[in-house]
Amino acid sequence: MARTIIRVPFTAGVDNTYNVVVSVLQSNGYKEISYNGETVWKKGVGLLTAMQYIKIEFEENSLIVSGWVQAGLGSKGGSEMALNGVVAAVPKKSVMKVIEEIKRSV
């Protein structure tokens, strides 16, 4: 799995932080889905641009945010791509902007 992983410390409780993150994700058009047995947030279907994914996890007082894109259509998508490099640069930048918004919000 090629994912960009960012650890974000937080001081509010887990429930409050989760609600803030969900609000940011929903306001940016992400939908909660099950993906290979994981609960993740997804935007897009891969028709015109790569599908965008964000996964959130909690570990002590840190929020762990994973982001990646996947080119292809629906469940027939290609392999996961971390948020660096030039392939699919526009959707990668879009995912990073949402992650930065999450970091500012918590």
Report each predicted region and the residues it spans.
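Ser/Thr-rich, low-complexity intrinsically disordered terminal regions
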Residues: M1-V106
